[in-house]
Amino acid sequence: TEKRKNEPTKLIDDNGAKILKLQIGNIQKTNLLEKGISTLTLESKFKRGIEKYFNEVKFDLVLYSTPPITLQKAVEFIKQRDNAKTYLLLKDIFPQNAVDLGMIQTKGIKCLIYRYFKKKEDSLYKISDYIGCMSNANIEFLLKNNASIHNGIIEVCPNSIEPIDINITEYEQKQIREKYGVPIDKTVFIYGGNLGKPQGIDFLIKCIRENQGNEKSYFLIVGSGTEFGKLQVFFEKVKPKNAMLLNQLPKRDYEILANSCDVGLIFLDRRFTIPNFPSRLLSYMQASMPILASTDVNTDIGRVIENGEFGFWCESSDAKEFNSLVIKLCDKNLRRWMGTNARKYLEENYTAKHSYEIIIKHFK
């Protein structure tokens, strides 16, 4: 629980499961300095919490994910104390992602920050008995750039969910679109989620600007983040007729609105050398929605989407190609076919049961 909520650390019982709700510093929706300090203090807070609340508990398996990479000492403490096995779910490769975006330098005085976090990253890999990556491209990147990692401990263990059926009537879809002024007679492309540096917002703006002549499509951008202000300035200045920007919505309204759209959008900055694999993909697939991904060339999310025949991909530097794919996806029959493929692919590859079986096979 972040400090801003003013809730003390507490241990709760949820149907027999003991959950420790630690009070930590503010990490989300704050400035970089506060976020950095809060992230650095995480492992000491976790370690103290484990010692205080779980001193008599013996753990057999520790599951942990990135971000953040600053839990190494807490994981190592349990591993040594309880002789526990450790499994890292590698959802983000830091600090290289920050280097790619120019946020951290590898040379000069500023390289000290990089060296600190790189050491943390190496230590996290070292204490991990197994490493589950989001995709094959992640495995290739990790092995190529970390000679100390043995390929026998690394495998694909992708993001996953427990799929639910999305049941929204045509009346509800029409009602929610009318409530927020979203056209009911156009193909609506939605981006929902973080609006930060990793998303390459400048390219998103370029796509909206260059697609204004398409009378069949409409862009709905819903989210928050460090780049929201840049988008807001663009919308206030240009007032694009083919797009809408929304910040925060009531949870139920967002769920209905998002699932009343036609195509899910994924954006990644073209400068990335690490193969990101955004979890946003899964919510689109759950809604039987085709996906248009515009990313760097190093991620394999585009290959997964196109091989599964549930969407299209283009590089996040080619607005003309992006807009040609937008035109293709204005075909209702194509969207219906791809949407069905998306849901099927999700159920066959990205369920919580699949992830469980990948992890637990090591401990049977």
Predicted regions and their residues:
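Nucleotide-activated donor-binding/catalytic signature segment of Leloir-type glycosyltransferases, i.e.
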Residues: 216, 220-223, 228-255
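Conserved donor-binding/catalytic core segment of Leloir-type glycosyltransferases
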Residues: 183-199, 205-208
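A short helix/loop element that forms part of the nucleotide-sugar donor recognition site in Leloir-type
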Residues: 6-10, 167-182
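Acceptor-binding helix/loop patch of EC 2.4 sugar-transfer enzymes
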Residues: 27-34, 57, 82-119, 164
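Membrane-proximal helix-turn-helix segments that form the acceptor-binding/catalytic region
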Residues: 73, 77-81, 111-133
